[in-house]
């Protein structure tokens, strides 16, 4: 079984709860902001903890270090989707994540000119699936085309600058929306009254 959040990107949710369930993989959905509750779901069949560092679209922020420490006590690897927070602003490896997945179509590409994804295995767990991974890469392909790699390299050159401008614009917009009377709630972690603000820092 896989333990993960109730709040996930739609395609990830579908993969875990529909596609993988056909192959006998149970997905245990829970509130990843409650580490004790997550730990109670761990059993002998738990193969990994999957998390989004900041959930999409709810924008819940999880305590990555606390979750990885708990998972590692039980010998469980942690896979983290860090797409929504660029790696220039966040280091999953330093917080104990074992495998990081990133949709490079988003921030890295930058100009919506290419599709791509990254899987970064930090080599902390002797995954029994290495043989299966090699077979999958052989059958499905493991490399970007040169054109896609080139387009994404161009995006990398401006990633940090683009992210800083986007973050400043998002904060300014969130603050402005807070002043408009018809709007009753603004869910943005950059706002100091957001319940995840301190954790997101």
Where are the regions that the model predicts?
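Active-site-lining helix/loop region of Rossmann-like oxidoreductase modules
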Residues: 201
């Amino acid at each position: 079984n896989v333990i993960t959040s109730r709040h996930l990107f739609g395609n990830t949710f579908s993969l875990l709860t529909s596609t993988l369930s056909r192959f006998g993989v149970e997905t245990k959905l829970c509130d990843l902001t409650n580490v004790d509750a997550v730990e109670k779901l761990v059993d002998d069949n738990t193969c990994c903890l999957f998390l989004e560092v900041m959930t999409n679209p709810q924008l819940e922020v999880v305590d990555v270090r606390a979750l990885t420490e708990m998972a590692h006590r039980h010998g469980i690897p942690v896979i983290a989707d860090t797409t929504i927070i660029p790696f220039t602003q966040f280091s999953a490896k330093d917080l104990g994540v074992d495998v990081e997945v990133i949709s490079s179509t988003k921030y890295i590409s930058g100009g919506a000119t290419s599709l791509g994804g990254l899987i970064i295995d930090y080599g902390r767990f002797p995954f029994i699936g290495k043989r299966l991974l090699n077979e999958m890469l052989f059958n499905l392909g493991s490399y970007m085309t040169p054109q896609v790699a080139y387009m994404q390299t161009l995006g990398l050159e401006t990633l940090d600058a683009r992210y800083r401008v986007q973050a400043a614009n998002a904060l300014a917009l969130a603050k402005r929306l807070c002043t408009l009377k018809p709007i009753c709630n603004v869910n943005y972690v950059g706002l100091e009254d957001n319940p995840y603000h301190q954790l997101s820092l």
